[in-house]
Curated annotation (Swiss-Prot):
Domain note: The C-terminus contains a calmodulin-binding domain, which binds calmodulin in a calcium-dependent fashion.
Family, as annotated: Belongs to the MLO family.
UniProt cross-references to InterPro entries, sorted A to Z: Mlo (IPR004326)
Residue spans, topological domain Cytoplasmic: 37-59, 176-284, 327-359, 424-544
Classification via PANTHER family: MLO-LIKE PROTEIN (PTHR31942:SF103), MLO-LIKE PROTEIN 1 (PTHR31942)
GO cellular component terms, semicolon-separated: membrane
GO biological process assignments: defense response
Region (Disordered): 485-544
Protein name per UniProt: MLO protein homolog 1
GO molecular function, one term: calmodulin binding
Residues on Extracellular side: 1-15, 81-154, 381-402
Residue segments, region Calmodulin-binding: 437-458
Localisation per UniProt entry: Membrane
Length: 544
């Protein structure tokens, strides 16, 4: 079967050329696989479990792209033999029809549904050799997708996956760079100056605290507060007083007051957990990609509004996160007139849309994918012969869309994503990233032993009908097992559950927090907790 013009079949190619090309591809593939393996080993060595899982999901995405490529290769010839009418083939084209001679409109239209064959046959590149005879032309019809268009679609999917992974890594890198500024604020919490300034026996009027002064006043006016929140995300999205107040509220709600808890390291762990979600192209995002390709026909400007929507969503999310901080400050002001010690907010899901903090992550994941789609589409159309003339008739407009997408990516990575990592900790529940591997293993062992003891108690019930019931042994408590695992700063016995989290989950309810009089008397901690955490360090240790 004859190949395309200017090309040769494999039987007409020298064996040394085939061997050289094959060897280069194999060496590059093995080198990439070895590099990913080394990276995974480094994550395991330094106990970066979340990043290791993110790497595994990245490998899964590359495998998915490989499966798609394989399907495109296998089904290329059968799909190119599927014929449709010319009327159907000329509807919803991404570019204006033109005639081959003058480049203007005409009846001799060239189909450009994600493909153009270019000026001459020398531009054609196929995954497999095309059929020698156009079956559909004999029937007066056109092919559903030609071999050339399927090849270009295959290239675009690969470029999209690469840019999504690249944008995810950039987002994680810039977010951690921004969060490094918060580390010095976390270090100040261990100083005597901070402990003296936030002495539990010290009282202040609520309206005199820095947090209330920053977020109330003119900012509390309805309508104006949204404008203030919108502009605040660009200049002072997170200040020192915001960080310290949210930190204190998290500790009071989920731990016990006075703990030396490394809140900054906890946020970093939570961010790594979220990175596992961001780096993956979920089924919902693939559906969004298919929807954009479906709507990308001439006349509605899909690519234009697609470059604007991510920026609008990011600004909306950033404004909402700033509003959450302002609403918590307003609640402190309305709840009590005198603050004892450090002012602390009360975490709750009620501050977020539909009581779902995880929806914020989905919106950011969506905008990240849309930005990657836009950049991948730009690179793909510019690098593919014929498509540049189709999609970039006004190159200045195309460059403006790319600049807008890059600005949205920087805004997401350096401002919105770190703000999300901090503010979403103010939900009703802690993230599981607070537990390390040793603690999780101890909990698993306790669960296994609890099942075994339950079976033993069920068997003893038959023997205890005439006598007393069985008495649980000393080792049936998870705290007992975790004590054997070693006194660590992030063990569950050092991390009592939040009263709000237990109330919402149907667990044991605790009385509401009360502010004692400012006479130097301090509320005593639970004796059960003091027995396990006298002066414990709640910092997470990722290196051993």
């Amino acid at each position: 079967m004859a190949g395309p013009a200017g090309g040769r079949e494999l039987s007409d190619t020298p064996t040394w050329a085939v061997a050289v090309v094959c060897a280069v591809m194999i060496l590059v593939s093995v080198a990439m696989e070895h590099a990913l393996h080394k990276l995974g080993h480094w994550f395991h060595k330094w106990r970066k479990k979340a990043l290791g899982e993110a790497l595994e999901k990245m490998k899964a995405e590359l495998m998915l792209v490989g499966f798609i490529s394989l399907l495109l290769i296998v089904t290329q010839d059968p799909v190119s033999r599927i014929c449709i009418s010319k009327e159907a083939g000329e509807k919803m084209l991404p570019c204006k029809p033109y005639d081959g001679a003058g480049g203007g409109k005409g009846k001799d239209n060239h189909r450009r549904l994600l493909w153009l064959q270019g000026e001459s046959e020398t531009h054609r590149r196929f995954l497999a050799a095309p059929a020698g005879v156009d079956v559909c032309a004999k029937q007066g019809k056109v092919a559903l997708m030609s071999a050339g268009s399927m090849h270009q679609l295959h290239i675009f999917i690969f470029v999209l996956a690469v840019f999504h992974v690249l944008y995810s890594v950039v987002t994680m890198t810039l977010s951690r760079l921004k969060m490094k500024q918060w580390k010095k604020w976390e270090s100040e919490t261990a100083s005597l100056e901070y402990q003296f300034a936030n002495d539990p026996s010290r009282c202040r009027f609520t309206h005199q605290t820095t947090l209330v002064r920053r977020h109330l006043g003119l900012s509390s006016t309805p309508g104006v507060r949204w404008v203030v929140a919108f502009f605040r995300q660009f200049f002072t999205s997170v200040t020192k007083v915001d960080y310290l107040t949210l930190r204190q509220g998290f500790i009071n709600a989920h731990l016990s007051q006075g703990n030396r808890f490394d809140f900054h390291k906890y946020i970093k762990r939570s961010l790594e957990d979220d990175f596992k979600v961001v780096v993956r192209i979920s089924l919902k995002l693939w559906f969004v990609a298919v929807l954009i390709l479906f709507l990308d026909f001439d006349g509605i400007g899909t690519l234009l509004w697609m470059s604007v929507v991510p920026l609008v969503i990011l600004l909306w999310v950033g404004t909402k996160l700033e509003m959450v901080i302002m609403e918590m400050a307003q609640e402190i002001h309305d709840r009590e007139s005198v603050v004892k010690g450090a002012p602390a907010v009360e975490p709750s899901n009620k501050y977020f849309w539909f009581n779902r903090p995880d929806w914020v992550l989905f919106l950011m994941h969506l905008t990240l994918f849309q930005n990657a789609f836009q950049m991948a589409h730009f690179v793909w159309t510019v690098a593919t012969p014929g498509l540049k003339k189709c999609y970039h008739e006004k190159m200045a407009m195309s460059i403006a869309k790319v600049v807008l997408g890059v600005a949205a990516q920087i805004l997401c990575s350096y401002i919105t994503f770190p703000l999300y990592a901090l503010v979403t900790q103010m939900g009703s529940h802690m993230k599981r990233s607070i537990f390390d591997e040793q603690t999780a293993k101890a909990l698993t062992n306790w669960r296994k032993m609890a099942k075994e003891k339950k079976k033993a108690r069920d068997a003893a019930m038959l023997m205890a009908q005439m006598g007393g019931g069985a008495t649980p042994s000393v080792g049936s408590s998870p705290v007992h097992l975790l004590h054997k695992a070693g006194a660590r700063s992030d063990d569950p016995q050092s991390v009592p559950a939040s009263p709000r989290a237990e109330k919402e989950g149907g667990g044991v309810q605790h009385p509401a927090r009360k502010v004692p009089p400012c006479d130097g008397w301090r509320s005593a901690s639970s004796p059960a907790l003091d027995a396990h955490i006298p002066g414990a360090d709640f910092g997470f240790s990722t290196q051993r």
